[in-house]
């Protein structure tokens, strides 16, 4: 606790450089090899962060060193307040962001900017651009476009608008806006990957659900955001770079629909369990028949995988019954 409190002193004592206090929150787990680049870019934004929190689910001393170095060299050497929060218990992405967000609010944050450990903002002006978008469109929450880290014109995750799947950044703009004047995609946001939340937004929708651990906790938070009546969206003028995750969305029916099939048993466990939980929630129940149709077709018709279908059903039943056990 002493080390944590010492880290908080610089934020409490120094004069405010901006009218709004923006606190960054990063959650990491055993990725010190790639975390350093993310922290370096976060620490050198043209609109500087006022404080940076790292929640370390791996309790790795190397992460603390990376954070301290980022804080010391931030903003052309003027420095930045940092807080390292090691966890003896793996909280998952959901619990890690919940802890970090609550701590940011306790510090007095007006805005909380989230980032993960294997991605990073696309340059030094991302935070400034997001805040400009907030002001222009009067937003309570805004996210950048999430693009593939080694192919920035490609979306890291496909996005469906109506019946059409969008896979490139340019496809997010409206057809009647060839000059790209409108910089907001309203009502849609990728949460955690560069997502910026106002304190008012978090007071209204809460923080991620610890029980979900990972895989879908951001979708459940998005559900709350949709139902809150708050104004939010994606700022098309800036991006967050992330490893491509499109491969786990398997096309079915000639590409008209997709079924999510992650590449590891752990990812499948939490994805399908959490989707069972999510589909039982207000605002998502209308999608249940579509969910059954997609996965029945994928497992039984396309893959001919009866065992996989049974496991999908078992896991979604666990989630629907709120038996949100950790994977054995």
Model regions and ranges:
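Short, well-formed alpha-helical segments that are part of the catalytic scaffolds
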Residues: 31-45
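A conserved acidic beta->alpha catalytic loop
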Residues: 56-67, 89, 119-120
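Glycine-rich, basic loop-to-helix element that forms the pyrophosphate-binding segment
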Residues: 87-107
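Short beta-strand-to-loop acidic/aromatic patch adjacent to the donor-nucleotide binding site
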Residues: 109-118
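A recurrent flexible, glycine/aromatic-enriched loop bordering the glycosyltransferase active site
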Residues: 177-197
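A short, conserved alpha-helix in the catalytic core of glycosyltransferases
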Residues: 195, 201-206, 211-238
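Non-catalytic, C-terminal membrane-associated alpha-helical segments of glycosyltransferases
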Residues: 279-328
């Amino acid at each position: 606790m002493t080390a944590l409190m010492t880290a908080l002193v610089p934020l409490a004592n120094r004069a405010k450089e901006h009218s709004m206090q923006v606190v960054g929150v990063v959650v990491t787990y055993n990725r010190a090899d790639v975390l350093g680049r993310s922290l370096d870019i976060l620490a050198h934004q043209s609109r500087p962060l006022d404080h940076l929190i790292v929640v370390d689910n791996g309790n790795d001393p190397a992460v603390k060193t990376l954070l301290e170095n980022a804080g010391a060299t931030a903003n052309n050497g003027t420095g930045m307040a940092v807080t390292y929060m090691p966890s003896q218990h793996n909280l998952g992405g959901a619990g890690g962001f919940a802890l970090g967000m609550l701590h940011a609010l306790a510090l007095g944050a007006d805005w909380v900017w989230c980032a993960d450990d294997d991605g990073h903002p696309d340059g030094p002006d991302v935070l400034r651009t997001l805040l400009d978008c907030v002001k222009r469109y009067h937003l309570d929450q805004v996210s950048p476009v999430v693009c593939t880290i080694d192919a920035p014109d490609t979306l890291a995750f496909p996005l469906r608008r109506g019946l059409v799947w969008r896979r490139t950044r340019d496809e997010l703009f409206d057809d009647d806006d060839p000059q790209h004047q409108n910089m907001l995609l309203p009502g849609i946001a990728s949460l955690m990957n560069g997502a910026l939340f106002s304190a008012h937004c978090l007071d209204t929708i809460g923080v991620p659900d610890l029980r979900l651990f990972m895989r879908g906790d951001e979708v459940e938070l998005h559900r709350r955001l949709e139902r809150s009546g708050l104004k939010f969206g994606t700022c098309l003028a800036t991006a967050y770079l992330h490893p491509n995750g499109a491969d786990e969305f398997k096309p079915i029916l000639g590409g008209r629909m997709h079924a999510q099939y992650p590449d590891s048993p752990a990812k499948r466990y939490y994805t399908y369990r959490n989707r069972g939980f999510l589909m039982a929630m207000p605002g998502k129940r209308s999608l249940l028949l579509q969910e059954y149709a997609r996965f029945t077709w994928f497992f039984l018709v396309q893959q001919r995988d009866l065992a996989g279908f049974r496991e999908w059903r078992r896991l979604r039943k666990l989630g629907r019954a709120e038996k949100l056990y950790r994977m054995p």
